[in-house]
Every structure is written in structure tokens, then in C-alpha cells.
Amino acid sequence: MKPNILFIVIDSLRADKCYGDKKTSVTPNIDSLIKNGTYFSQNITAAPATIPSISSTLAGLYPFECVAKEGNFFVVNPNIDNYVKNLKEYNYNCYATLPVLISYLGFDKVFFNNLESYHRTSTLYNGLGEKIIERFKSHAMSEPWFYYLHLYDLMWISTPARFNPDEGPDEIRDDKYGKNQYERIFSVMDTWLGRILHNLNLKNTL
């Protein structure tokens, strides 16, 4: 039986806020994944922006090899082989949940009808997390599946005009969960990641 694959991308996550003695966020679930998995402390991104970086990750190539330009935008090159295409050839059902802002930058030609997008201000704690959990509870994805989950919670804080910490959970305003809003939001994300993992069959999920 082929294992399911959950691939989580946390946009704008800094390595020093995820691991090490400088972080002040509270992340027991991510800490457990690191302890029981593999953590690459010397990993260097191929690009400082989302599309070229993710394109490189999915294709295993440098951005100039796997990114195409459509009008004024750089997109995932649909003519280049990537791991999603390879998984489909091995009879995996490939799904994605990601911000609408980037869903049309080539991802629609990778996941096609199995792509679900959400508004950029949606976060795990304001409804998105429940939708993701319901997806697992309802067995909405046919096995074996590959699920690309792109989270934008940390990006939202970079747009202060749209970020109101008073609308979020108490942890966002509690220094116990981090010395700044960025780290406190990451603490909240960890709680939700734990809930998501709790609803998975971890014995058959990578």
C-alpha cells in the first residue's frame, strides 16, 4: 500500500524562529516532527520569493530552469517535469490548498481541478484550519494522495492594514507564546498543525 504524502509550506517562515535557542515561539508539534524526523539546518533557498523558490522545490532545478514568464508575472513552468507530475504517473491523486494570490501563477496547470484556493487573509485560526481538518475527516481525497498545503498565516502580518491581533486567539496577545506577533502567530499555527496531524493516519502518511 502506497503511503499518503502531506507536503506543508509555511510561507515566510524564518529558520531561526522555527529551531534553535533564539526562538521564543511555543511549537511542541513542530519540535516533535524535528525530533522524530530530519531537520536540515544548513538548507539554503534557491530564491527569496515564493514562486521561484517553490518551483525549484517541486522540480529540483534552479529557478532559471523551471520558471516561465507570462506577461508581467513569473509562473511555475508547465512544460518542465516536476515531482507532482511524477507522482501522478505512479497513480497518486494530487491535491493542493493555497492562497488565491498565487494559485494562478502556474499551480492551476499542475493540480488542475484538484486545486482549492483561499483568500490571502485566511488563516488556520479563522476558519481555514477547520476546512483542512474536515477534508481529512470526510476522506475527500482519494488514496493514495499527495496533498500540497501552502499556509499564508505569517504573510498576513506583513500587511498591517489588514491585520488586527484583537480578532485572533488570545495567544497572539500573550508574551508567553513569543516575544513578538510573528512568533506568537507561529505558536498558534503549531497548535493547528497538531490538530491537523491528529486527524491523519500517521502510520500511512509521510
Segments and roles (model prediction):
Residues M1-L206:
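Catalytic domains that recognize anionic headgroups
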